[in-house]
């Protein structure tokens, strides 16, 4: 087996110790598992790959923390000091740990027990070591990452009708600005439901989910098929 990509023992011990200090400062004396959260959301952006607003993840954060995880904020969420203050040591960014952003991001991506967040570079980096990933707002529809639960963006025609699954897997599998569809990120309720399902699956894996035959509709050259 190929050994996991990790920081040096010295750097890992440094960050691990500061995570523990942050928990204790917030009144949390017990150890915690680690969740890396990645956001790809830019305020007022109309880009088709923009993720969900970070505030839409807050109920999910509460659920994740309730399951014993400390959350490391990466991506566009990293500057949200208000979330660090709100969750008292169970949500941290690089400023809270007084370390560089590069060190923070590399530790989070390579040491976390789980990943939760938007599709994008942060998800791909975390896939190197993380066994369980929940990737929200995946688009284009052919994209995927290994070992992940994938929740795609919502897609509908210009008249508001939802795009059928078989068309997402074929006609609209790749991004084309000429497509006559609109895509929208998952909302707060979608995210919370996805996180609850994800955490339950980690604790007690099911034998399978209905609709698995539909996966065969996806192009064989797609990342979605190759990662399953």
Sequence positions of predicted segments:
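Conserved nucleotide-diphosphate donor binding/catalytic pocket of glycan-assembly enzymes
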Residues: 1-6, 29-36, 140-143, 147-148
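A donor-sugar binding/catalytic signature common to diverse glycosyltransferases
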Residues: 104-153
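Leloir-type glycosyltransferase catalytic cores
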Residues: 1-24, 148-228
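Catalytic donor nucleotide-activated moiety binding site of glycosyltransferases and closely related
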Residues: 32-43, 54-101, 211-223
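Polyanion-binding and phosphate-handling cores
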Residues: 80, 87-94, 123-125, 131, ...
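Short, solvent-exposed loop/turn segments at secondary-structure boundaries
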Residues: 47-50
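Well-ordered, non-membrane alpha-helical segments in soluble/globular domains
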Residues: 52-60, 109, 191-193
